[in-house]
Amino acid sequence: LVGSEMCIRDSAYTATERKRVSFGKIPEAMELPNLISVQRESFERFKDEGLREAFKESSPIQSQNHVLEVTFGEHQFGDPAHTVEECREKDMTYQAPLLTDVRLTNKETGEIKEQLVFMGDFPMMTDQGTFIINGTERIVVSQLVRSPGVYYSSEMDSGKQIYKAQIIPSRGAWLEFEVDKRDQLMVSIDRKRKQSATMFLRALGIAVTNDDIIELLGNSDVIKRTLERDTALTREDALIEIYRRLRPGEPPTVDASRSLLEGLLFNPQRYDLARVGRYKVNKKLNLTTEEEVTVLTDEDIVATLRYLLSLAAGEQGFKVDDIDHFGNRRIRTVGELVANQFRIGMSRMERVVRERMSSQDIDEITPQSLINIRPIVASIKEFFGSSQLSQFMDQANPLTGLTHKRRLSALGPGGLAGHKSGSSRRTNVPTAVRDVHNSHYSRMCPIET
């Protein structure tokens, strides 16, 4: 009887009732912080804001003839079907159903159909900051990545110093400028072949004539040499030439090229500096662009080039950045990593929705019949099951579990993988990344991480 009574008392004793009692004579100087708040808060933020943003980015999905339009509204989570204990015992995933308001609008008739659509079961975080996937406890490790922004670097190439500028977005195409060994200003869009940066400026319509370019960037030797090599003299020539480099094999047209560049650099759905990126760009280049503008602007590009030219000319006050400094890095926590994966699933689902819009009978269509949740479910399952950052929780003792939840990793998608320069062989990580940097002091434990 005593045994069974103990059991009952145990199950009623929940994690929230635990009180920390100190038996020391000297009072504790500081209250112990919640050490797994990194994980918990991030996932809570994702459940609310992260999902809302992902749905907002995908709305509206339009049919090819622009008659039908699907938009996503508010979302909510149902209750998990099983408790954490049941999931552990029966090798199940601890998850809750995700439901979303979906509205289907027929623009011709003005008819609107609304439904609460089931978007699949979503793994939930336990109070301990872990996930239970098929009965095993897993942890999503936070990822250390380069912060979006603009970076300057230099390297030696056949005895000459080369200066580079990179505009790195949170999501989208990289833009790299460099003053090469022939002292010309070059640009590489989305890591494709290098081309003249003045041609790029013409194509964007920032500066079209040679005089415009000299007025914008000054009359240095670098600019003179670049203009001599630049074959395109009008905006149309420049657009066609750039399209040839970006999409070799396709017939180049001015309109196709213009929409390609617009889409790559100025479309918020495909290019996002994020607020941290906008802040870093403004700070580095002394700009005053609004924080809400998270795509590139003409000023960003011009200011980046001006700084690069001053740096290459060796002017005072212009210096290259240290990539390994923590000021140039940021942490992607669980919430952001899961949100990115959810976005991938959503974009795959969009294709299915468009196909179904064109194939189904317009009068019969309902939001439920259009939406196929398989891509989303598969994408989330893939992340928790096989991503480099979703790891089997270290359960040697309570402390190893805690340190595992607070660990940082530079690997994983969007982090470092197979680098060209000096790398430690086993994981292809550049040795410089593994070095202890003075900015780590009092921020990151060099041993546990």
Can you name each region flagged by the protein language model?
Residues 426-448:
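Membrane-bilayer interface helices and TM-boundary transition segments
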Residues 4, 9-425, 437, 449:
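N-terminal non-catalytic structural scaffold regions of very large proteins
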